UniProtKB/Swiss-Prot annotation:
Brain (most abundant in hippocampus and amygdala), placenta and lung. One of its GO terms (biological process) is learning or memory. Residues 94-187, 204-229, 377-417, 457-530, 574-726, 818-867, 881-943 are annotated as: Disordered. The lineage of its organism: Eukaryota, Metazoa, Chordata, Craniata, Vertebrata. GO terms for cellular component: nuclear speck. The modification Phosphoserine is found at S430. Belongs to the AF4 family. Residues 669-679 have a biased composition (Basic residues). InterPro entries: AF4/FMR2, AF4/FMR2_CHD, AF4_int. Its main location: nucleus. It comes from Homo sapiens. Residues 478-491 have a biased composition (Low complexity). RNA-binding protein. Might be involved in alternative splicing regulation through an interaction with G-quartet RNA structure. This is AF4/FMR2 family member 2.
Length: 1311
């Protein structure tokens, strides 16, 4: 758009000059073209040298042409400008030169002879007339290019010629010259592209192609339809609209096109619209001959402008200039240039000499189309090429545009070499042109109005938006050709296309309303696109173009979506409808893409989908959804794209990804479903390079995009839902896919338990199904739930289904369990059998899915009653412990018990019949059955997990349930861990509620069983058998089976009586520091309390932690502190706690006495433990003392008694036996009795150590006495925790006392 800005300025400066010198310049250029191209002046019979001077001094140039002189002054000499353009360093300085223009026209071959090339191009335009078969740029490109080229060449060729005459052009350029110089510099690059485009045969071929394409395109009458449409565009369109159409090419080409009189087209309204732009205004001819455009396209395009007559032929007597100008252009012949006097409708009035203007426009139109087309055809250039064809098509006959694009072979042939070169330059310069390209493409897609809008969008970048022109929509052919360009454009901007596509599509649909809505982008007046292209875009655009061209989409324009702005995206969207024109344009694009990386068109649909997804994703997830919807709208607008897109989808089965393949097929349906959507999406899909980019973008959200793709693939069935929920509900989408007929796949996937990422990564609905079956629990059901899964993504629903499957498994399991039940008659047999049963159940459960349901009705029915019965029993037993709430679990059992209460009762009776053994053997089988029935019971458990079943019920059948759940997990493809975790969860709940010691133990056992079940079947079976026995006993509390409880008589009796809550103890071992910290916390807590009983309880609890610390010290010999010292300090703490409450007082409460008992027990065992720790020392002391006594035994015997003498030397109690022989031997008066100090200390230490035993027994006896007063409490404690003895370990002591303290807290309401 910089070119437009530059030309606006330049045109504004040169408006009067154009009006005055236009004729001369046109004539000069025309002569130059004729000389350079060595073609007869077919189109330009007047043979005016419009660009002779500016581009290159030609023999036939009218030296006296004021316009040429002014162009030269503005643009400079061709050689000079050629050098400037050729020199990239200079190009960087040439801010005024739009890089887009340069890449559009300049080709590598034209770089040296930029303006001569232009002349040559002028000749090829003649050749185009003479050799219409010569390959040329896509018709739409040629049309827009011709129009733009006329404008560009008028400005650019003149400017180029002026640049050719650097002194003159540069001198006259003045303020516009810096930009113009940049334009010149970029024009040299553009000249390369022009060289690429400039094929004498190529240019004429464009005309023919345009002529033939119109018929090939939607408009069977390319000349008249394109001409009429173009006339309508320019005549009916407001100047801005016409300007838009011209400017949609995104370069001075627009001006040139406007200048070029299209014989069949009146450019009256259009040029003013174009001229409303800075350079287009009144200087339209000059604006179209803008130095920018001229330079960009001058070398190659200027000569190529001659195809204007061909264009007229192809469009009907419309020259690109005429079509683009939208003015009443003179006949397509150059003589009509006077007529062509570019309608000075708005800002810029074309030169006063309409004939010159017309000739110039024709020349420009004739020569420019190919260069512009080629230039824009590449990557972004492709877009601009499409854009130009779109505009030209709109201005010209849509048929012509379609012809252009529809005659890809000719264009490819003529352009192939030059177009490739120009394409490269284009790629370099097309980054900015891409913005214009979208306009061009939009123009092609849309009517002149849309073209104008697209141009306006492009304009904002380069020039102020001109008043919208009311351009009648070109025939579908125009749109189709534009679609080609726009598809590439939309590809480039596919990211934002999602949003803009719908808008653009709507614009296309409502082109008239959109006509006046060009989005004025900040004109990059100083930042010429050519500059941008030469420096920055050269590599980038080549890369993008390579990537984009790789996509062998008919759309040449595969600009990177990032580069394309929203406007471009909108244009692309409009072009999306024009995508059908792509095939014709494709040859030229193919050449460009061959350089890049041609990709099969089949990938294009995928690319579109991907791009579209990516664009949607880039915008937002919501935009993603909206974007898809919008693309749908676009597709609706362009059924052609929809048609084309499905084809690529078909072809795309081979391309990039499975997703692509999947997308190809379902997107077809989706596109079909949403015919409005295919165009934009088609464009994105054609842009496979962009699709990969989007995939890259999707890489982060890769799952979602794929999900989107899958959604798109499957969106034919659930499009909107998929779009909205695809990201969040990938699982849901897979279900939809599942219902779509992937039920078997979903099963497999579910069985495989594929991860969501894997599902996403893998293409196909199978992955989606896997995703939908994210929970492995449902995996076994996919067949039945596949269809249900899509609607029922709720885990509950799936769980319900899964529960049914579990029931099926259980039905089989019961049979196996029954088989195992027989062998497990004895308790031990049961234990042994139960593992077998579990194994069998697991094995059976795995195959069960097939036969589950068969067995389910029978075995499950029976087993369910059993479970219910057991549940009832368990519930009853659970009801016994206050902490456990059997009612909730009982209620679920009641639900099933209501159905199977009779069976449960019957089984209970059966259990009663064989009281000891049979119940146990049957219980394990029942458990096995329950395990088998756990499917049904598992349903209940699942329900419980869902909130239906209470923890008590799981507690009852936790062991069974674990096995069952495990079996289910195996059958379902779920890992045992899940089953175990579920069981553990239930167990934890049960434990939390379990108050009874036996119940808690059972729960713990069950938990262990669950884990063991997941890991070891044998161990689990044993535990499960015991647990089942205990559980059965608990459940059958009404008639306990002593045989069952024989194994655990203590637990059975106590468990039935104990109703207090049981603490859950952690078996993990910690270091001494851990326990020390815990003890300190409790001690500090006690210190903070004021209530003595609570303080005493906390001190006692802290003493237990200290005891654990001492025990840890015993385990770790490296502990610095001796465990004996720790125990000794603990004893002191306990003694202090006991002093807080006088349990001996008659006012002492039961709680005080209970606490005293616990403290005495603890003290007793601590003393005994302390003795044990010092036992070795005590033994050593004892031996030493004994030896000492032996040595002095005889003497001691002779002495009456150490203290019988005068009372002197009365031995201390420790040394009573150590009376010195002297005292014994000698008279009592003979001297004091001496005892060795060593013996004295040994005796004292020995007494201290042995005294611990005495104290221990003493405290124990005290505890026994106090216990008599609270037999029930301590009886329950003994029952729950096991009786505490003097030989109990410190761990048992701590747990026993801590449990008692817990109950004391509960009784004292301290908790």
């Amino acid at each position: 758009m910089d070119l437009f800005d530059f030309f606006r300025d330049w045109d504004l400066e040169q408006q009067c000059h154009y009006e005055q010198d236009r004729s001369a310049l046109k004539k000069r250029e025309w002569e130059r073209r004729n000389q350079e191209v060595q073609q007869e002046d077919d189109l330009f019979s007047s043979g005016f040298d419009l660009f002779g001077e500016p581009y290159k001094v030609a023999e036939y140039t009218n030296k006296g042409d004021a316009l040429a002189n002014r162009v030269q002054n503005t643009l400079g000499n061709y050689d000079e400008m050629k050098n400037l353009l050729t020199n990239h360093s200079n190009q960087n300085h040439l801010v005024g030169i739009p890089k887009n223009s340069v890449p559009q026209n300049p080709n590598n071959k034209n770089e040296p002879s930029f303006f001569p090339e232009q002349k040559n191009r002028i000749i090829p335009p003649h050749q185009d007339n003479t050799h219409p078969s010569a390959p040329m740029p896509p018709p739409s490109v040629v049309i827009l290019n011709s129009t733009l080229i006329h404008s560009n060449r008028k400005s650019k060729p003149e400017w180029s010629r002026d640049s050719h005459n650097p002194s003159t052009v540069l001198a006259s350029q003045a303020s516009g010259q810096p930009n113009k110089m940049q334009t010149l510099t970029q024009d040299q690059s553009q000249a390369k592209l022009e060289d690429f485009f400039v094929y004498p045969a190529e240019q004429p071929q464009i005309g023919e192609v345009e002529e033939s394409n119109p018929s090939a395109k939607e408009d069977s009458n390319p000349n008249s339809s394109g001409e009429d449409a173009f006339k309508e565009i320019f005549q009916s369109n407001s100047p801005e609209e016409s300007e838009f159409a011209v400017q949609a090419p995104g370069s001075p080409l627009v001006a040139s096109s406007l200048l070029a009189p299209s014989s069949g087209l009146s450019v009256q309204n259009f040029p003013p619209g174009l001229y409303c732009k800075t350079s287009m205004g009144q200087q339209k001819p000059t604006a179209y001959v803008r130095p920018m455009d001229g330079q960009d396209q001058a070398p190659d395009i200027s000569p190529t402008l001659k195809p204007s007559i061909e264009f007229e032929n192809s469009f009907g007597n419309l020259s690109f200039g005429t079509l683009l100008d939208g003015k009443p252009s003179a006949a397509s012949s150059k003589t009509k240039l006077p007529k062509f006097t570019i309608l000075q409708t708005s800002e810029v009035s074309l030169p006063s000499d309409p004939s010159c203007v017309e000739e110039i426009l024709r020349e420009m139109t004739h020569s420019w189309p190919t260069p512009l087309t080629s230039m824009h055809t590449a990557g972004h250039s492709e877009q601009s090429t499409f854009s130009i064809p779109g505009q030209e098509s709109q201005h010209l006959t849509p048929g012509f545009t379609l012809q252009k694009w529809n005659d890809p072979t000719t264009r490819a042939s003529t352009k192939s070499v030059s177009f490739k070169s120009m394409l490269e330059d284009d790629l370099k310069l097309s980054s900015d042109e891409d913005d214009l390209e979208p306009v061009k493409t939009l123009t092609t897609q849309c009517t002149a109005t849309e073209l104008y809008q697209a141009v306006e969008k492009a304009k904002p970048r380069n020039n102020p938006v001109n008043p919208p022109l009311a351009t009648p929509q070109p025939p579908p052919a125009v749109q189709a050709s534009g679609g080609s360009g726009s598809s590439s454009e939309s590809e480039s901007s596919s990211e934002s296309d999602s949003d803009t596509e719908s808008s653009t599509t709507d614009s296309e649909s409502n082109e008239a309303p959109r006509v006046a809505t060009p989005e004025p982008e900040p004109p990059s007046t100083n930042k010429w696109q050519l500059d941008k292209w030469l420096n920055k875009v050269t590599s980038q655009n080549k890369s993008f173009i390579c990537g984009q061209n790789e996509t062998p989409m008919e759309t040449i324009s595969l600009p990177p979506p990032i580069i394309q702005p929203m406007e471009v995206q909108m244009k692309v969207k409009t072009n999306a409808s024009q995508v059908p024109a792509e095939p014709k344009e494709r040859p030229l694009l193919s050449l460009i893409r061959e350089k890049a990386r041609p990709r099969p068109t089949q990938k294009i649909p995928e690319t579109k989908a991907l791009k579209h997804k990516l664009s949607t994703t880039s915008e937002t997830v919501s935009q993603r959804t909206i974007g898809k919807k919008q693309p749908k709208k676009v597709e609706k607008n362009t059924s052609t794209d929809e048609f084309t897109w499905p084809k690529p989808n078909i072809t795309s089965s081979t391309p990039k990804e499975k997703e692509s393949v999947e997308l190809h097929d379902p997107p077809r349906g989706r596109n079909k479903a949403t015919a409005h959507k295919p165009a934009p999406r088609k464009e994105p899909r054609p842009n496979i390079p962009l699709a990969p980019e989007k995939k890259k973008y999707r890489g982060p959200g890769k799952i979602v995009p794929k999900s989107r793709e899958f959604i798109e693939t499957d969106s034919s069935t659930s499009d909107s839902n998929t779009d909205q929920e695809e990201t969040l509900q990938i699982k849901v989408l897979p279900p939809c896919i599942i219902s779509g007929g992937n039920t078997a796949k979903s099963k497999e996937i579910c069985g495989a338990s594929l991860t969501l990422s894997t599902l996403m990564s893998s293409s196909g609905s199978n992955n989606n199904l896997s995703i939908s079956n994210e929970e492995p629990t449902f995996s076994p059901i996919p067949v039945m739930q596949t269809e249900i899964l899509s609607p029922l993504r709720d885990h509950e629903n799936l769980k319900n289904l899964w529960v049914k499957i579990d029931l099926d498994l259980l039905s089989r399991v019961p049979g196996h369990s029954s088989l195992h039940a027989a062998p497990a008659k004895p308790d031990h047999k049961e234990t042994a059998t139960k593992p077998k049963r579990q194994t069998a159940v697991t094995a059976v459960e795995k195959p069960a899915p097939k036969g589950k349901r068969k067995h389910k009705p029978i075995e499950v029915a029976e087993k369910i009653p059993e479970k219910k019965q057991r549940l009832e029993e368990a519930t009853t037993i659970c009801l016994l412990p206050p902490c456990i709430s059997p009612a909730p679990p009982h209620k679920p059992p009641n639900t099933r018990e209501n159905n199977s209460s009779r069976r449960a009762n019957r089984r209970k009776e059966e259990k009663l019949f064989p009281p000891p053994l049979s119940p146990l053997p049957e219980d394990p089988p029942r458990r096995r059955n329950v395990s088998g029935n756990n499917g049904p019971f598992g349903q209940d458990k699942n329900i419980a997990m869902t909130g239906q079943i209470t923890s008590t019920k799981p507690k009852r059948t936790e062991g069974k349930f674990c096995a069952t759940f495990k079996g289910i997990s195996v059958n379902e493809g779920d890992t045992p861990k899940k089953a175990s975790s579920a069981t553990i969860t239930v167990t934890n709940t049960a434990i939390a509620t379990a108050t009874v010691t036996a119940t808690a133990i059972v729960t713990t056992t069950v938990t262990a069983t669950a884990t063991a079940t997941a890991t070891t079947t044998t161990t689990t079976t044993t535990i499960s058998t015991i647990t089942s026995t205990i559980t059965t006993g608990l459940m059958d509390s009404s008639h306990l089976e002593m045989t069952s409880w024989a194994a655990l008589p203590l637990l059975s009796s106590s468990s039935t009586n104990v109703r207090r809550p049981k603490l859950t103890f952690d078996d993990s071992v910690h270091n001494a520091d851990y326990y020390m910290q815990e003890a300190k916390k409790l001690k500090h807590k006690a210190d903070a309390l004021f209530e003595k009983f609570g303080k005493a309880v906390n001190y006692a609890d802290a003493a237990l932690s200290f005891t654990e610390c001492g025990n840890a010290m015993e385990r770790d010999p490296l502990e610095a502190k001796s465990p004996y010292t720790m125990y000794s300090e603990t004893v002191e703490l306990l003694r202090y706690a006991m002093r807080l409450k006088n349990f001996a007082s008659p006012l002492a409460s039961d709680g005080d006495k209970k606490l005293a008992v616990l403290c005495y027990r603890c003290l007793s065992l601590l003393y005994l433990r302390m003795f044990k720790l010092k036992k070795d020392h005590a033994m050593k002391y004892s031996r030493s003392l004994m030896e000492y006594f032996k040595q002095n035994a005889s003497k001691v015997a002779q002495i009456p008694s150490p203290w019988v003498s005068n009372g002197k030397n009365t031995p201390s109690p420790v040394s009573l036996n150590n009376v010195s022989p002297i005292n014994a031997m000698g008279n009592c008066n003979n001297g004091p009795v001496t005892i060795p100090q060593r013996i004295h200390h040994m005796a004292a230490s020995h007494v201290n150590i042995t005294s611990n035993v005495l104290r221990g027994y003493e405290h124990w006896d005290m505890a026994d006495k106090l216990t008599r007063e609270n037999k029930e409490f301590f009886g329950d404690l003994d029952t729950l925790m096991g009786p505490l003895t003097q030989h109990s370990s410190m761990t048992n002591l701590v747990r026993y006392v801590r449990q008692g303290l817990c109950w004391l807290r509960i009784d004292a309401h301290l908790l």
